[in-house]
């Protein structure tokens, strides 16, 4: 039995949810999100809660059960509170700035990188060494953060590069004479 899947998703005040077959749509103060649940699970709206249950006891249904519940929960949190991912830039001359619909990054290459900001995502650079990515879709916020980090991942000797806030970088010692 899935410990996560058996918990119903509570819908807070100010958020409306609609379930039509396998399609779930959630609307809140920050926007609207849609999700289509896999056929292995059934989704039901019970008052101010959304309950997810497996249609059978096979392995695929049990695997999709907890995942579907978590995705529905992330939809509800996204439209009510939103999601944020912070990145830190470390290195001499490494910096970021938002210019219009682009994030300009100087990451030690011979050229600056212009990263286009997609619709539905807000990117801010409160300091030249900090980038904040916010949005209502947890998957998209994490994906954009991963794409920016992949432009210059932190290296293990000096820690230069783009890393998630709070991420531990395994450090190595330089070669000895």
Swiss-Prot record:
GO terms for biological process: cytoplasmic translation. The keyword Nucleus does not apply. Keywords: Ribonucleoprotein, Ribosomal protein, RNA-binding, rRNA-binding. SUPFAM superfamilies: Ribosomal protein L6. InterPro entries: Ribosomal_uL6-like, Ribosomal_uL6-like_a/b-dom_sf, Ribosomal_uL6_a/b-dom, Ribosomal_uL6_bac-type, Ribosomal_uL6_CS. GO terms for cellular component: cytosolic large ribosomal subunit. It comes from the Bacteria. One of its GO terms (molecular function) is structural constituent of ribosome. It holds the Pfam family Ribosomal_L6. Belongs to the universal ribosomal protein uL6 family. PANTHER family: 60S/50S RIBOSOMAL PROTEIN L6/L9, LARGE RIBOSOMAL SUBUNIT PROTEIN UL6M. Part of the 50S ribosomal subunit. This protein binds to the 23S rRNA, and is important in its secondary structure. It is located near the subunit interface in the base of the L7/L12 stalk, and near the tRNA binding site of the peptidyltransferase center. This is Large ribosomal subunit protein uL6. The gene is rplF.
């Amino acid at each position: 039995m899935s410990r996560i899947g058996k918990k119903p998703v509570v819908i807070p005040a100010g958020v409306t949810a609609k379930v039509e077959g396998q399609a779930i749509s959630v609307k809140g103060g920050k926007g609207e999100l849609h999700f289509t649940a896999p056929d292995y699970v059934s989704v039901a709206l019970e008052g101010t809660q959304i309950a997810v249950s497996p249609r059978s006891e096979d392995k695929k249904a049990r695997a999709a059960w907890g995942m579907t519940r978590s995705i529905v929960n992330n939809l509800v949190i996204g439209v009510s509170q939103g999601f944020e991912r912070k990145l830190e830039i470390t290195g001499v001359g490494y910096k970021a700035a938002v210019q219009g619909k682009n994030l300009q990054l100087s990451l030690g290459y011979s050229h600056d990188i212009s990263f286009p900001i997609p619709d539905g995502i807000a990117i801010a650079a409160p300091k030249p060494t900090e980038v904040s990515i916010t949005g209502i879709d947890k998957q998209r916020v994490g994906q954009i953060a991963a794409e920016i980090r992949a432009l210059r991942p932190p290296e293990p000797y000096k820690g230069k590069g783009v890393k998630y806030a709070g991420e531990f970088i395994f450090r190595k010692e330089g070669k000895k004479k």
